[in-house]
Amino acid sequence: MKVTRRTASIGALGLLAASSLSPAHALDDPLLDPFEGKSDFWLAVEAYIYGYPLVTMEMTRRVITNVAKVAGTKGPMGQIIKLREYPNASFTDVTAPNADTLYTTAFVDVGKEPWVFSIPEMKDRYYLFPMLDGWTTVFQVPGKRTTGGEPQTYAITGPGWEGKLPDGVTEYKSPTSIVWILGRIYCTGTPEDYKAVHELQDQCNLVPLSSYGKDWKPSVGKVDPKIDMKTAVREQVNRMDAVEYFTLLSELMKTNPPTAEDAPMVEKMAEIGIVPGKDFDKSKLDAHFVKRVPEIAFARIMLHFKFSDGDIADINGWGYTTKTGIYGTNYLQRALITAIGLGANRPEDAIYPTSTKSKDGLFSRAYAGSEDYVLTFPKGQTPPVKGFWSITMYNEKYFFVDNPINRYSISARQDLKPNADGSIDIYIQNKSPGVDKESNWLPAPKGKFILMMRLYWPDDKSPSILDGSWVIPPAKKT
């Protein structure tokens, strides 16, 4: 038998999917059955991957907005959520959360009318307010890099909207009805800087166009007791069977239409009962596929991290991509970013190198809290950025790790101590490296963990991660 890249990938998919099945399931329903001449099965897998961002975005919206009033990390539709301090280890609303900025966010439905969003004068402070459509595409991103620090006001309009806007209001047209304003304002975390950022957050304003310039007060949010507010969104999505998943996808596409680029995919999905603007026709989906499609599709999404056809670079144990925020027809890449970093920015705004294994020469091994690691930046070679950089610690599910010093990321704001030669060591371990080294300590859990580096507004001139002229050092076992 000749082993091709496709058969190797299928084999890897089988191993990944099998690991998530019980032994009884694996024996009673052989894993390889769907692989044998079932073109409809693979089409359903494609459709699942295609729709993963939209379904995940909707489930995220439901959980975040299912409250009567703004509180903590949640707030009703059309109301600004202002995080007043960094998220802690209990935060599971969004995978790979940020511990370097104060989120200032809101979900709006621009299907019925536009919403007007105003940003105050930011001066020299780093900030950005990316606007994501239902498919996780960043269709606009006002911020320090793009629009500067002056006061600015935008009307976010939905598909097919035509009308006149007030003077001084710039139109940002969303391709979908769902819009997530996922603002980030840099904050050092000191009491003084918290206060300064809180004042900026309070000056941000969001109102429906019909109430712009009026004394508008948001209504009490509607709470749906049937929505699961405890289980992480990704787990809720992954637990859906194919019928439930495609039913929701079809419903969402009525107000969050595919793009013109998606036409070939839309045509194929019709064969299994998925048609934009119509309810899902489950009679066209083989009943034997209902449980297996989500398992295999999600395994394929995660496998893309290793078999990415160039979408993911792998250097010194760090995987990263410059293909985020705008995806075109690269549905697999879009789904992967949704799974491991929902809300990712455009590469000009941020790059997110991620590492799951320590690499030393030809050898690599999964990170474990039972071992100690060190990452060394040579003198003058900390990450080249115009915004900020950090390294964040996550558990194996991409959530924060509880630790005795409540530190979830490390960056220049820790006042890192250099070595005698000017290099900087970052100590990555479960136990403290000692009082004299704690400024450079990134606490790890006892079990497996993941590292994510954030490079906000990376330099576009050499040395730069954008063109590969700056190389991330490895985290080595000590």
Language-model segments: residues:
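Intrinsically disordered, low-complexity, compositionally biased regions/tails
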Residues: 15-18, 321
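C-terminal segment of classical bacterial N-terminal signal peptides
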Residues: 18-24
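A compositional/structural signature for long, glycine/proline-rich flexible linkers
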Residues: 27-478
